Amino acid sequence: SSTETPPSYNQLNYNENLLRFFNSKPVTAPVELDPPKVESSYVSSARGEDARSTLSPVQGFEGSGGSGSSGNFTTGSNLHMSSVTNTSNAGTGTSGTGNSGDGGGGGGANGTGSGAAPPVTLTESLLNKHNDEMEKFMLKKHRESRGRSGEKNKKSANEAMKMLEYSGPGPGHGHGIKRGGSHSWEGEANKPKQQLTLNTSGGGGGVGVGGGMPLFLDITHASSSSQNKGLAGVGVGGAGGVVGGGGSGTGLGGNGNVGSGNGNNNQPSTNQYTQSRLPCTQNINLWPPFSVGITTPTSVLSSHTAVPPSSFSPQHSLFPTFYYIPASIAASSPSSTNTNPNRPHKHAHVHNSSEKPSTSQAAAATMPLQYMTGVMYPHPSLFYTHPAAAAATAMV
């Protein structure tokens, strides 16, 4: 039978029926005995059996079956054998009553007092009832046996899953570690940016614009109000601001207050970038072009201080402004700024006419050198295109 449908009672019972039949050692009668005597012997033997024991009627029938082995009786016994199991120990093996003509005395096979038992007629309903009970019992056994095998399979499956779980965490945790490392690396890459923005609020703040504002807001505010806070180095992305040098160290870029920031801007303009950078770079100068005392960088820096909001606003979209000093602002600043009011205010020594080409050239010359170590930039093309844009804006 298929595993889906439970086997029938006869299928489950087949081997047990065969064993029970041959263990009973049936005694076959000579063929001379006629069927009526066989039937009488069956009745007498069944009368001697105890009806209350589950199998006694049937086993009495099978045990005395040897007494008359005429054709119809043996077929009947075989039919019952195929449908009835032997679970009680009514001694059918000894119940062969031999060849007695009337079959009397067959009840001795049952261990109980055969004579005292009330006569029981073996009916079809009794056999059906017995078969139903035994079928339930056999199906229960079958389910239990299948359940054991199913449990074994489940255990093996669970063990396999456990093995996978134990082996899984190796690569799984490896991925997790990689992810964690990447996140921490990204976090470290972003940390300078965050620190810069916080410091830039101080940077512009030291200049008097006040902390808490973004870098570009501080710078534009400072440059528009007195343009002395451009000293924070608008070109430097608020160099005083980037490092917070202006904000924290008022003695540096944004010396003192908003109005006085420009006073030192000439000489600290070069130092301002270096000194204001110191908090971020741990006293390591990462922007050599501005630390060198060359006239063109100073002029570039002086022009940075005078950048108005209009020239700086286009740079808001360039996220690297927090990372490096955008020299393009320096180039574009002279053309768009009111140099006359700013220059006497900032640097009287700067030449307005000659500064435009010098600033663009200086921007082009210094742009490739403005990378900060330890900072990721999107692509070099962004920076190499700035000088051209700066020159174009300067020519306007």
From Swiss-Prot:
InterPro entries: Period_circadian_regulator (IPR050760). One of its GO terms (biological process) is circadian regulation of gene expression. Keywords: Biological rhythms, Cytoplasm, Nucleus, Phosphoprotein, Repeat. One of its GO terms (molecular function) is transcription cis-regulatory region binding. Residues 27-120, 164-188, 253-273, 333-362 are annotated as: Disordered. The keyword Iron does not apply. Forms a heterodimer with timeless (TIM); the complex then translocates into the nucleus. This is Period circadian protein. It comes from Drosophila pavlovskiana.
